[in-house]
Amino acid sequence: MAEFPDDQAARLCDNCKKEIPVFNFTIHEIHCQRNIGVCPVCKEPFPKSDMDIHVATEHCQVTCKCNKKLEKRQLKQHVETECPLRLAVCQHCDLELSVVKLKEHEDYCGARTELCGSCGRNVLVKELQTHPAVCGRVEEEKRSEAAVPPEAYDEPWSQDRIWIASQLLRQIEALDPPMRLPGRPLRAFEADPFYSRTASQRGVTAHFPIQNNLFEEQERQERNRSHQSPKDSAENSAHLDFMLALSLQNEGQASSMVEQGFWESVPEADPARAGPTSLGDIKGAADETLLPCEFCEELYPEELLIDHQTSCNPSHALRSLNTGSSSIRGVEDPGAIFQNFLQQATSNQLDTLMGLSSSAAVEDSIIIPCEFCGVQLEEEVLFHHQDQCDQRPATANHRAMEGIPTQDSQPEDRSPELSRRRVKHQGDLSSGYMDDVKQESVKGSTYSLSPNRTMNNVSTCNRLLNSSGPRSDCQRSPPGVLKLNNSGSQDIRGRIRGSQNGPIASAHAPVIHSIRNLYPENLAPSFPHGSPGRFGASEGSRSSRVTPTAASYHSRAAKAKPPKQQGAGDAEEEEE
């Protein structure tokens, strides 16, 4: 293409967007519009004959190995600069790996150490480039730092210890009467199971790990005692140090548990062992033989087990509450008095359990064990206790029940569920029938026996009196058998009037009079009647059991038979 002079003008082609000289612009414009076209994607001029090839090769969508889709003409730049799977070199080991894993590899690879030839220290690989600037300075800084003495760490704690001890002493001196706690060697408390437990067994986090160890505490006390004056060491007694250790061990526990366990473990004064405790005695406490109590199952030293079991025995609990002192009273030292005072002030569990209130001590009271449960009680309480003792056998109640009336003499209480209503028929006797008969028999007869009454009424009345009430003085009439026969009723009535009515009426007039008054003749029977011919001689016993009402109703038609033997009549009465 020929060069144009600088002074020659040029024009911009609207089709290809290029500057064309003015003298050739007309020819170029015609040719460009006919043969050259603009790519619709990249806006670049291409021959119209090659436009399809250009779009297919340059603007087609391709997929990178990182699964990203882009145009083919942009793939090269993406792989070189943007693809996360492109290869890169580790700056520590010159190993090629993908960019995705490069960061993790550099952290792992840079954590390796290499020995520095100048200072002789092991330096991290990732710090090798910056290490020469600080090589040798770290050792100098460590040497320049002064080591902190052990006393410097104990100074804040020593102030807290003095404050805690002063608070404890202030509370103890406020008691009335004021007294000093008896000294107790650290070895005895080390053997105590409550204080020998570890922090994990009590479920408490140790906030002061140094002070929780009694061995280290004792060593620190001996070291501080050597630097203190005799006056200062006399003030810091062993008991205050022990109280401080207890307050640290019980840190985080419930207040009730700490107070109860602490005051129960206040020892008695022992002058023989009140001296300063050595470290050897403390370590020897671990070799002591601990035996469990048979009541509370706690571990105690062998020489203290008997004393503990004596006080822990439940059978002595009521005695200690009621009496407060035995028949032989000894002189108690101030330590024991103070211990009892604190136990009564901090816990009332035994009083609540037994349901008793603390009372004044009874002087010269006699203690006698219960013969059933073995609990030792006072003489005044023993009788009432044995009467209500749970272990009292059943045979012990016979003597007490002698003066009590028996159950037979007491009115019988019947349950309403067990009582059954008696079905009452029309022909049955009323409940006051026999009482009326007896009253009539005592008063005597007013009327003589009616001539129209048969022998059967007298015999029936006698059977009823003999079966349900006491026997009367009158002579019992022989039982008669009824036979219903209406055809000869007039003849039978005449015979009875002439032969038997007189003597029988004189003997049984009161009874017959009462029956006639209670049951009139017009009372209808409650059972059906049969024909006169159906009853034979073999059914005499059945006919003899007719009720007084039925006998009175059939008295005019009844036929009296000869009396049977005395034994047969008694058998029928027993059946009634």
Curated annotation (Swiss-Prot):
Positions where Phosphoserine occurs in the chain: S278, S320, S326, S327, S409, S415, S430, S450, S531
Gene: Trafd1
Biased composition (Polar residues): 540-552
Gene Ontology biological-process entries: negative regulation of innate immune response; response to cytokine
The entry's keywords: Acetylation, Metal-binding, Phosphoprotein, Zinc, Zinc-finger
Tissue-by-tissue expression: Expressed in vascular smooth muscle cells.
Function per UniProt: Negative feedback regulator that controls excessive innate immune responses. Regulates both Toll-like receptor 4 (TLR4) and DDX58/RIG1-like helicases (RLH) pathways. May inhibit the LTR pathway by direct interaction with TRAF6 and attenuation of NF-kappa-B activation. May negatively regulate the RLH pathway downstream from MAVS and upstream of NF-kappa-B and IRF3.
Bias (Basic and acidic residues) ranges: 411-420
Pfam families: TRAFD1-XIAF1_ZnF
Protein name as catalogued: TRAF-type zinc finger domain-containing protein 1
GO annotations of cellular component type: mitochondrion
Chain positions covered by the region annotation Disordered: 402-432, 465-491, 529-576
Renumbered zinc finger spans (TRAF-type): 27-103
UniProt organism field: Rattus norvegicus (Rat)
Residues annotated with N-acetylalanine modification: A2
